[in-house]
From Swiss-Prot:
Catalytic reaction annotation: Cleavage of hydrophobic, N-terminal signal or leader sequences from secreted and periplasmic proteins
Record topological domains on the Cytoplasmic side: 26-63
An example Gene Ontology biological process: signal peptide processing
Organism: Buchnera aphidicola subsp. Acyrthosiphon pisum (strain APS) (Acyrthosiphon pisum symbiotic bacterium)
Classification via InterPro entries: LexA/Signal_pep-like_sf, Pept_S26A_signal_pept_1, Pept_S26A_signal_pept_1_CS, Pept_S26A_signal_pept_1_Lys-AS, Pept_S26A_signal_pept_1_Ser-AS, Peptidase_S26, Sign_pep_all-beta_subdom
Gene: lepB
CDD domains, per database record: S26_SPase_I
Protein name (Swiss-Prot/TrEMBL): Signal peptidase I
Record's keyword annotation contains Transmembrane helix: yes
Cystine pairings recorded for this chain: none
Pfam families, sorted: Peptidase_S26
Amino acid sequence: MANILTIFLLISTLVTGIFWSFYCIKSFKNYLINKKIINNNNFHQEKIEKSKNKTYFLKSLASFFPIFLAIFIIRSFIYEPFQIPSGSMMPTLLVGDFILVEKFSYGIKEPITHKILIRTKKPNRGDIAVFQHPTDHNINYIKRIIGLPGDKIRYDLHDKHIHICTNYSDQRGCEKKISINYSQSRSSNFIQKIYFSNKNNIKEDKNIYNSLYFDIVEEIIEDVKHSILLLNSIKNTKENYFQQKNMPKLTWIVPKGEYFMMGDNRDNSLDSRYWGFVPEKNLVGKAIKIWMSFDKNENEWPTGIRINRIGSIH
């Protein structure tokens, strides 16, 4: 969907740009005629009227060119709005948040192939980034950057903590262990609905659910502090996690030019723990602000506006 919209904007900009060029040429020619700079006795009144009609038609189409051009440039190279559709980044981002993504944060890229044209700065650990899914470029995800190229990452299933060391190699091991601290967990108002069926397995039973309350924990990775949600009442197993070649499960070494992403809602997020690393070329940009927030649940209509959520993202 993301690439389709970009291609549509590009084609629309090119087509209206052609009409805009014809309109400019036609307008200049009419200007010369009206000033009697072109001496052409074959221009009768009827032909002049037809020329005016054609000019009006061209003007109507050409008027869209500046609009499409501005949208294409801003959306492709500067800022792009996104909507948060799921709760994988709770409590930092909620369903119904509309965010602004800075497209030039990780380099100015060609909008179709995403080849980096001008490098700006590298992604930082702790950034919240929008990216294309590694295997399906039509799907955009938003997660927090946890692992940088060369990092060795270990995820502890028991306490759900992460352990990171930088510039790992088989010969010298880790260069530096990243400081990661966790607060004591406390109860929160965030709820995870667990759906189930009754004995008769009736279709309407999709509306029957039990609710589990998330615990909230402060996670501090070096100097980046943020909150994460955990379902401590649920114990995960290793089976579904991504296993890197020649590595034990739950331990990964981030390849060169790739990144390890995780959602802040740790027990309700499909991320690099499940499908692997994200290439740098897949990074769309850095999420910087919430510009609108509707009070809504997933797959439901909004019931209000959350003005207090508008502002910067941390």
